Every structure is written in structure tokens, then in C-alpha cells.
């Protein structure tokens, strides 16, 4: 599974943000820019600022521009105007106060086809979104569902630790690949929550063969991520949309076909297990009930299930891997966390019930989400009514893009923002409101539905990993902080030396 992640990883939620540059769909330019438009970044005729974003890490470029043009400015991508927001204050104004004017998402062609706008993270706010979110909250992400799956989540962490201990016992002196072990178990947890079992293999009729769990992951996660960032130049120049783009269309249709084939095979398998009374209650049961009451079509059911399977992996993987990297890089902070765990839990394994009594663990999580936000840039939204942001006129027809990375690097909001310092969330200078200055899970009505589960899994995992093992970076890895293109996934998987505590 490591080979898959080396090329790309993450669920539809991260995939949507990974497509953020492509998501600046060209629309009819605003007729009237108003009397007080945001500052504009100089660009070239026709293409605007597209040539300045070719490094595929737009969040870094946006943040650099904010030093010159301020927390809000306008760029051009082809025929479209995009207002980029780089401060938490202005971002929350857009997401909460002005939500009614800029709630519609604009998607690139690839993401639009792959999602058909029938996914929770992609659909616009309306009846379908509310129905779909209600079902996933009841099945997986709500309070009662979280209690139901608590033992499953904690068993997943125990399985990761068991695998790590075995690898250390076999070769105690060589660094091991943390991501490979962790992702396998995370994907297994996702399959249990969504389908009722950790699927080892499934027969896919369209392929004419049985495929392994690793290939299921490849089709449902890696291929989808690779597809949605596939550029289609017609997104930027809508007046040329009548021209064919055969290579793009072939990639998208092939990816959609393979995804649908695997998902339909998994759904068929689970329907058979449900009929035999073998399956535990999971997300698919709630979706089937919604389908039977005519709220969902078969295709919508399949898309919602595919989204949830992939989404359960991305945020937790990114956050946990970065947290363990920072703790291994900063042994003094690792020991601080270890001492806190010993004082609170003694020799007992950390559980979700212990989390409220572990303030430094909470600080480690929030600081990791701030510095390494799983979604560096939120998907573009469309302004459908004239509005204002930070006192500037933003006319209908404009698009709004929130640079989460830039918000978290804002020197007016954070002291030494480039440093990983959990202590900023502790002590006399810390205010509870500081936690909400991070935008890792969005804000307002579209706050990420899976935030509580992501926090619970990541916190228990981080605590248990530090509680049982001493973490040291592989030699030479102390400066490997680069990310994979549009995402926050570490470009280089975390390789660490582990030493069991007390040995």
C-alpha cells in the first residue's frame, strides 16, 4: 500500500481541495467590479496569473502574495476572477456572515464528473446535502454512532502498535515506514464503518477477477485523487468548451468506470451478507434504507459510500503522520507529552475517555492542524449575489478561494507562525478562542462532518504511539517537510527508529 501512497493519497474531501487550481472554473466575468475592488495581482493578458501558479503548490504562492497585497486580493485564471482570502477573520466572514451570497461551489470538470455533485463534501447546500449529511451523522459521525464504533477505533490503534512492535522485534536497528502500516489499518477501519467488514478481496465482474484489498484502495483512493487533479484547459476558457479534449475525457471516464465497478461489487457483496444476517450495522444500512424510501438512487448511494470510504483515511493520516514527525524531530516535546500521559493514565493504555485530561496532547493536535492543515486551500466558491468582504466590493460572478495555509501563517494572528510550538495553545497567553482560529475543518454550516472522529482517532493514536514507543527520525530526515503537490500529505513517508518504552 506504500507504493500507492507514494503517488498520492487522500479521500474526496482532500481531493476536492487538491483540485483547487483547476477548480477556478472560468465563468462570465463580473460586469461591474464595484467602486472598491480588492487589490489585483498583476498578470498577463488572456492567461492572467496562471503562469505564476505552475509549481502546483498554490497555497505557498498565495501566502507570499499576501505579504504584498494584504489578506484579500484578486487574481485571474484564464477568463475568471478569483478573490483569494488569507486571514481567518476574512475567511470566516465569507464562510459564516456572507454564506448566503457565496455558498455555491465551483468544480473543475474532472471533479464534477467523478462526484456528479452527489457527495456530502461536494454538493451545494440544499435538500440533498442535508439528507446526505443526516445519514452519515446517524451512521458514523454522530454522537451515538461514535460510541458504537469506539471499540473498533481503539482496536485499530492497537493493531497498528502490534505491527510496529513486530517490525521492531525483527529488525530493531533499521528505520520503518510508519505510513505503510498506519494506512493499512485506517483503510480497514473505514471499510468496517462503511460496509460492516474489513474486506480482504472482492470479485469484480467487469474486471473478470478477484481483486485484493490493496487494489481496492488503489481504485477507490489513489486513482480518484490522480483523476480529480487532471487538468482540462477548457475549465479556464469556457468559450472553447465545444472543442474536444480526448485524452482528458478518456482518463476521467476510465477512472469513473473502474471506481463504479469496484463499488458495485462491494455493495453487492454486502447486500448478500446483510440478507444472511452476517453483517454488523454500518453506513450502507442507512443508505439502503434511504434508497428504499426513494430518497436516493442506486448511483447516489454508490457515490456517497465511495466518498465516505476514502474520506475516513485522509485527514487522520495527514494529521497523525505530521504529528509523529514533529514529535520525533522535537524529543523534548515528545517527552513532555509522555510525562503527561504517565501522570494521567499511569500504565493504562490511553482511551478516548482520557482525552479531556490531556491538555498537552490537545495542544499537539491543534498545532499540527495549524501548521500542517490537511486541506491547504478550500474548494472555490461562487459569488452569486453582490457582496463585500473586508470592506472591498466583490460582485456576483467572482469566485472566492480560501487559503487555509495562508490564514495559519498570518503573522498578525500567530507569533512565529512557521514554528511548530504546541505551547502556544497552553499557558496564560492562550485563549480558548485560539483553537477556532484554525480552519482545518472549515467553519459555519459547512464545517467538516467528520471532524470529531478525526480528532478522536488522531489523538488516541498519537498518545498510544508515544506511550509505548520512543520515536526518532531517520538520519537526514529532519528537514523533509515538503508536501505532495496540492495536498498536505508528506512528500516523503515518515521513516522512524522506534524503541519500546522501558526496554
From Swiss-Prot:
Oxidoreductase is among the record's keywords:
yes
Q: Which GO terms describe its biological process?
A: ent-kaurene oxidation to kaurenoic acid; gibberellin biosynthetic process
- Co-factor(s): heme
Per the UniProt record, which residue ranges are transmembrane? 8-28
Gene Ontology MF term list:
ent-kaurene oxidase activity; heme binding; iron ion binding; oxidoreductase activity, acting on paired donors, with incorporation or reduction of molecular oxygen, NAD(P)H as one donor, and incorporation of one atom of oxygen
| Any single Pfam family the record assigns to this protein | p450
Q: What is its main location?
A: membrane
Q: Which domain of life is it from?
A: Eukaryota
Could you say which tissues express the protein in this record?
A: Expressed in roots.
Residues reported to bind heme: 448
Keywords associated with the record: Heme, Iron, Membrane, Metal-binding, Monooxygenase, Oxidoreductase, Transmembrane, Transmembrane helix
Location within or outside the cell: Membrane
Stated membrane topology is:
Single-pass membrane protein
Q: What is its EC number?
A: 1.14.13.-
Q: Which family does it belong to?
A: Belongs to the cytochrome P450 family.
Q: What does this protein do?
A: May hydroxylate diterpenes.
Q: What is this protein called?
A: Ent-kaurene oxidase-like 5
* UniProt organism field: Oryza sativa subsp. japonica
Encoding gene per record: CYP701A9
Amino acid at each position: 500500500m506504500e507504493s500507492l501512497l507514494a503517488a498520492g493519497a487522500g479521500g474526496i474531501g482532500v481531493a476536492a481541495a487538491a483540485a483547487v487550481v483547476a477548480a477556478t472554473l472560468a465563468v462570465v466575468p463580473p460586469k461591474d467590479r464595484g467602486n472598491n475592488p480588492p487589490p489585483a495581482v498583476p498578470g498577463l493578458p488572456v492567461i492572467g496569473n496562471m503562469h505564476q501558479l505552475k509549481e502546483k503548490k498554490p497555497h505557498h504562492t498565495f501566502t507570499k502574495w499576501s505579504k504584498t497585497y494584504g489578506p484579500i486580493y484578486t487574481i485571474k485564471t484564464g477568463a475568471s476572477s478569483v478573490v483569494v482570502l488569507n486571514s481567518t477573520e476574512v475567511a470566516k466572514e465569507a464562510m459564516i456572515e456572507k454564506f448566503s451570497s457565496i455558498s455555491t461551489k465551483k468544480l473543475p470538470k474532472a471533479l464534477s464528473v467523478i462526484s456528479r455533485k452527489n457527495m456530502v463534501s461536494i454538493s451545494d447546500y440544499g435538500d440533498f446535502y442535508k439528507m446526505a449529511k443526516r445519514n452519515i451523522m446517524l451512521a458514523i459521525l454522530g454522537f451515538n454512532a461514535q460510541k458504537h464504533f469506539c471499540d473498533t477505533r481503539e482496536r485499530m490503534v492497537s493493531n497498528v502498535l502490534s505491527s510496529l512492535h513486530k517490525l521492531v522485534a525483527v529488525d530493531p536497528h533499521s528505520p520503518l515506514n510508519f505510513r505503510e502500516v498506519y494506512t493499512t489499518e485506517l483503510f480497514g477501519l473505514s471499510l468496517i464503518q462503511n460496509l460492516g467488514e474489513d474486506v480482504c478481496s472482492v470479485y469484480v465482474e467487469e474486471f473478470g477477477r478477484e481483486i485484493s484489498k490493496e487494489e481496492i484502495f488503489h481504485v477507490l483512493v489513489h486513482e480518484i485523487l490522480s483523476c480529480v487533479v487532471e487538468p482540462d484547459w477548457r475549465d479556464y476558457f469556457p468559450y472553447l468548451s465545444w472543442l474536444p479534449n480526448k485524452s482528458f475525457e478518456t482518463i476521467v471516464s476510465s477512472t469513473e468506470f473502474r471506481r463504479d465497478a469496484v463499488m458495485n461489487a462491494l455493495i453487492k457483496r454486502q447486500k448478500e451478507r446483510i440478507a444472511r444476517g452476517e453483517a454488523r450495522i454500518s453506513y450502507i444500512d442507512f443508505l439502503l434504507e434511504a434508497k428504499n424510501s426513494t430518497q436516493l438512487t442506486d448511483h447516489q448511494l454508490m457515490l456517497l459510500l465511495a466518498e465516505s470510504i476514502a474520506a475516513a483515511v485522509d485527514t487522520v493520516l495527514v494529521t497523525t503522520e505530521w504529528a509523529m514527525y514533529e514529535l520525533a524531530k522535537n524529543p523534548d516535546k515528545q517527552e513532555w507529552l509522555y510525562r503527561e500521559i504517565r501522570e494521567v493514565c499511569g500504565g493504562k493504555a490511553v482511551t478516548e475517555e482520557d482525552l479531556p485530561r490531556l491538555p498537552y496532547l490537545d495542544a499537539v493536535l491543534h498545532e499540527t492542524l495549524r501548521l500542517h492543515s490537511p486541506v491547504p486551500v478550500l474548494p472555490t466558491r461562487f459569488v452569486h449575489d453582490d457582496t463585500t468582504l473586508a470592506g472591498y466590493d466583490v460582485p456576483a460572478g467572482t469566485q472566492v478561494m480560501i487559503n487555509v495555509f495562508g490564514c495559519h501563517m498570518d503573522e498578525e494572528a500567530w507569533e512565529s507562525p512557521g514554528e511548530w510550538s504546541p505551547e502556544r495553545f497552553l499557558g496564560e497567553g492562550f485563549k480558548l478562542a485560539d483553537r477556532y482560529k484554525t480552519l482545518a475543518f472549515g467553519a459555519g454550516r459547512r464545517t467538516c462532518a467528520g471532524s470529531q472522529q478525526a480528532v478522536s482517532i488522531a489523538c488516541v493514536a498519537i498518545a498510544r504511539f508515544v506511550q509505548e514507543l520512543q520515536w526518532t527520525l531517520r538520519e537526514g530526515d529532519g528537514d523533509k517537510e515538503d508536501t505532495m503537490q496540492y495536498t498536505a500529505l508528506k512528500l516523503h513517508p515518515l521513516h522512524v527508529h522506534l524503541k519500546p518504552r522501558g526496554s
